[in-house]
C-alpha cells in the first residue's frame, strides 16, 4: 500500500483556507506497528528553512521537504496514539476531535463534542 506522509505546513495552509477548527484522524490503522511515522515539518529552499509553503511556482519546484520522525503506535486507540495526537495539535494549533479506530461506524473516539453549524445536506 502506498502512503503519503503528513505534511504539516500544507495541512496548516488548508486548515486556514477552509476555516477548520478541529481534525478527524482516520485510517490510522494503516500505520499501526511502525515505531515512527515520517512527517513533513517544513521545507528547505537552498540554505533557507521554510515553515510554510512558498508562493512562487519556481520556489515550489525547488523546495525539499524536511522530514521528522514522530512517535508511532502499536495499536489504534486514544492511549497509544496520544503522543502523536499531542504533537499534531501542538504543530498545527488545531485540536483533534475525532479518532477513527477501525472500519466500523462504532469504532470511533470523540474527544471534543462539536455542534454542526449551518445547513446540513
Stretches with model-predicted labels:
Residues 1-121:
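Non-transmembrane, aqueous-exposed alpha-helical and coiled segments at domain scale
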Amino acid at each position: 500500500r502506498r502512503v503519503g506522509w503528513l505534511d504539516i505546513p500544507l495541512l496548516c495552509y488548508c486548515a486556514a483556507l477552509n476555516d477548520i477548527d478541529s481534525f478527524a484522524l482516520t485510517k490510522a490503522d494503516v500505520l499501526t506497528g511502525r515505531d515512527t511515522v515520517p512527517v513533513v515539518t517544513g521545507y528547505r529552499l537552498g540554505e533557507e528553512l521554510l515553515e510554510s509553503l512558498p508562493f512562487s511556482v519556481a520556489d515550489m519546484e525547488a523546495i525539499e521537504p524536511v522530514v521528522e520522525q514522530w512517535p508511532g503506535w502499536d495499536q489504534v486507540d486514544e492511549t497509544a496514539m496520544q503522543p502523536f495526537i499531542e504533537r499534531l495539535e501542538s504543530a498545527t494549533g488545531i485540536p483533534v476531535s475525532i479518532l477513527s479506530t477501525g472500519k466500523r461506524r462504532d469504532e470511533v473516539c470523540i474527544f471534543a463534542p462539536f455542534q454542526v453549524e449551518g445547513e446540513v445536506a
